[in-house]
């Protein structure tokens, strides 16, 4: 029995047509379940390189099929993560707002048509199921919790005209108890508030990280105007009060402005309000049902500060949080739910790992990809990369670490990670500056050997395993100064424990660092810069390595260091436009009362995602059909050396922002000998 779960949008990567509500159609993914067991899963953003991709997850579907060695026609059930009625309503809304469009007002027909175009096969409509959004979330959590019975809470911005679900999971059944309407959305409570802190959608976790710097007391009364706790364990949210009240009460922060103490206090008040509401709901329903286990999913369940406080509260004996709690996890839940309905339920086992994504491939394949980067990198094959990587890190290096299959979900759990020494507090600022290009207050997570976790962190008696970075826990007071780079301002950390049985390669590099330093912990953050998703492939890893100030890179069995590339090395690279980029010439005001024709490259549907480029670069990019050798194009456009250097510098800046791609030519596979041992 093969069930394919899908989340995401209903348009192709180069189309900007289905501009649906921003609380829906994002975080596209595909998950393949065979007889109740997950065999392959990946988020579309990892493959199409669009953060929170709202496109049809074509590449994700293709990966799942190829991994299983099957065709789309072999799939018994395709499960989409929303009800058909909701999808049809969204299409009708779209038609009203964009009457020039020609799309069917039948979501199943639209999905079938897209799958037929992309995979060359007609899908029997009886094999397509539309699954309730919040039931998808619920199944993703409960079916992987290992619990025979638990309360289930799903909370997010919205989906299927609802913002949450409270249910009871028992055996192979999920029975809803209560649904929370979209008007009472906890996700929107957070989103509407952070707009006045200079943030927007998908930035909620940043404000969670800012909250410990503030005091909730100054704005507590203000926030109590925004919600009401009801006697039956319910609540109401008054979203329409948030904007007017905050405009009158605070100094609104714009993006890029410094944070004042008022902004930090507001973040703390918001976090406190969220916690009060969720505790109110769960305490009531735990008492009336007598159930002492909890399964959590939905985007708000990524609030690991809330999760940590719930775990330590004693309301529940145990809590399971779905690692892919956001909408990508709905693809998983939809597939598991339909597999259960078709007679193949998931085993009642606690989820241990989520390394379900694409594999790096064989050593030979990895080596060939690396060699193609020629004069840009030095490569060394090593039989003990863990020891060498630990040596680099102990000597102060910040490195990329890429191994095996990629993780499903938003966390880098040791296979697509940036690693550093967790001890110097300066490492936090350094990584924020050289790689992430983000706010300096943002914390980093520690990865600790599972057997040593209790020595450094205050863990509840009921739980010693925290493999998914879902919970914030206190760092032991005696260890806080030692772990300066991973201890947040309030003395906590977002913990990952690492088991030798689950991820031996990652365990070994942490253990090698322990042997050198006495500390069985590494700083772990996702391997990406501030504009891209987490890297997935070898090419992604090398690109991010070359466009950041990382000191070294480990990919599989290979140690990699940067070379100073010559102009000839750059000329041998291929230049191409990503499918999500487009070129435009527009009339725009460039100075007061002066309008000119300007050139832009856009990475989204509107001019808001536009970067202005020179007319010379515009001409260069317009000449590309697919991909072209950079040197050949420069020869045509810029015979002058100064012009070449200026264009190359402009291209490098766009490459760093992922507006263009620079990469080896596909036919360029001439091998060179590997370098002598690399020292950082």
UniProtKB/Swiss-Prot annotation:
It is found in: Cytoplasm. Its EC number is 2.1.3.-. GO terms for molecular function: transferase activity. InterPro entries: ATPase_NBD (IPR043129), Carbam_trans_C (IPR031730), Carbam_trans_C_sf (IPR038152), Carbtransf_dom (IPR003696), NodU/CmcH_Carbamoyltrnsfr (IPR051338). Pfam families: Carbam_trans_C, Carbam_trans_N. Its main location: cytoplasm. It comes from the Bacteria. GO terms for cellular component: cytoplasm. Keywords: Cytoplasm, Nodulation, Plasmid, Transferase. One of its GO terms (biological process) is biosynthetic process. Involved in the O-carbamoylation of nod factors. Belongs to the NodU/CmcH family. This is Nodulation protein NolNO. The lineage of its organism: Bacteria, Pseudomonadati, Pseudomonadota, Alphaproteobacteria, Hyphomicrobiales. The gene is nolO.
């Amino acid at each position: 029995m093969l069930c394919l779960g899908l989340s995401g949008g209903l348009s192709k990567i180069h189309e900007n047509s289905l501009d649906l509500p921003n609380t829906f159609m994002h975080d596209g993914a595909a998950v393949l379940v065979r007889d109740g067991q997950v065999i392959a899963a990946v988020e579309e953003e990892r493959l199409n390189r669009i953060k929170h991709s709202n496109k049809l997850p074509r590449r994700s579907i293709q990966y799942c099929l190829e991994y299983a060695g099957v065709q789309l026609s072999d799939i018994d059930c395709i499960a989409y993560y929303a009800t058909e009625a909701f999808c049809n309503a969204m299409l009708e809304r779209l038609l009203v707002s964009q009457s020039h469009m020609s799309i069917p007002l039948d979501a199943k027909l639209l999905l079938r048509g897209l799958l037929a175009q992309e995979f060359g096969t007609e899908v029997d409509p009886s094999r397509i199921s539309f699954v309730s959004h919040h039931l998808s979330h619920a199944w993703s959590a409960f079916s992987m919790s290992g619990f025979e019975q638990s309360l289930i809470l799903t909370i997010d911005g919205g989906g299927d005209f609802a913002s949450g679900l409270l249910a009871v999971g028992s055996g192979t059944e999920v029975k809803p108890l209560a649904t929370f309407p979209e008007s009472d959305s906890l996700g929107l409570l957070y989103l509407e508030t952070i707009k006045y802190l200079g943030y927007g959608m998908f930035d909620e976790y940043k404000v969670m990280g800012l909250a410990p710097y503030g005091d909730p007391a100054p704005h507590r009364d203000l926030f109590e105007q925004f919600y009401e706790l009801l006697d039956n364990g319910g609540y109401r949210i008054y979203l329409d009060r948030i904007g007017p009240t905050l405009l009158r009460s605070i100094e609104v922060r714009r993006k890029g402005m410094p944070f004042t103490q008022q902004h930090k206090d507001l973040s703390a008040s918001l976090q406190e309000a969220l916690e009060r509401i969720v505790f109110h709901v769960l305490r009531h329903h735990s008492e009336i049902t007598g159930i002492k286990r909890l399964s959590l999913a939905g985007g708000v369940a990524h609030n690991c500060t809330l999760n940590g406080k719930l775990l330590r509260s004693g309301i529940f004996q145990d809590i399971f949080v779905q690692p892919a709690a956001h909408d990508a996890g709905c693809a998983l839940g939809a597939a598991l739910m339909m597999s259960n309905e078709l007679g193949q339920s998931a085993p009642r086992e606690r989820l241990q790992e989520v390394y379900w994504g694409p594999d790096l491939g064989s050593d030979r394949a990895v080596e060939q990809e690396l060699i193609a980067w020629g004069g840009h990198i030095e490569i060394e094959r090593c039989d003990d990369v863990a020891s060498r990587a630990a040596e680099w890190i102990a000597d102060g290096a910040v490195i990329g670490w890429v191994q095996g299959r990629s993780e499903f979900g938003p966390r880098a759990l040791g296979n697509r990670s940036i690693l550093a020494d967790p001890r110097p507090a300066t490492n936090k600022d350094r990584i924020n500056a050289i790689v992430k290009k983000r706010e300096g207050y943002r914390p980093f997570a520690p990865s600790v050997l599972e057997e040593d976790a209790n020595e450094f962190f205050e863990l509840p008696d009921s739980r010693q395993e925290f493999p998914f970075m879902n919970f914030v826990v206190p760092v032991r007071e005696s260890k806080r100064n030692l772990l300066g780079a991973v201890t947040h301002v309030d003395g906590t950390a977002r913990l990952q424990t690492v088991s030798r049985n689950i991820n031996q390669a990652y365990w070994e590099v942490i253990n090698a660092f322990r042997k050198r330093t006495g500390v069985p912990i590494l700083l772990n953050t996702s391997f990406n810069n501030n504009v891209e998703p987490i890297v997935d492939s070898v090419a992604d890893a090398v690109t991010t390595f070359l466009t950041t100030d990382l000191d070294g890179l480990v990919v599989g069995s290979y140690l990699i260091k940067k070379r100073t590339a010559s102009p000839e090395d750059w000329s041998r690279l291929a230049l191409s436009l990503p499918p999500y980029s487009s070129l435009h010439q527009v009339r725009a005001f460039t100075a007061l009362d002066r309008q000119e024709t300007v050139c832009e490259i856009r990475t989204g549907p509107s001019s808001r995602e536009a970067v202005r480029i020179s007319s010379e670069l515009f001409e260069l990019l317009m000449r590309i059909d697919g991909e072209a050798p950079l040197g050949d194009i420069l020869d045509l456009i810029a015979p002058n050396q100064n012009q070449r250097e200026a264009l190359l510098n402009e291209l490098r800046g766009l490459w760093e922002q992922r507006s263009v791609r620079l990469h080896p030519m596909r036919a360029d596979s001439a091998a060179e000998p590997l370098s002598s041992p690399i020292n950082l």
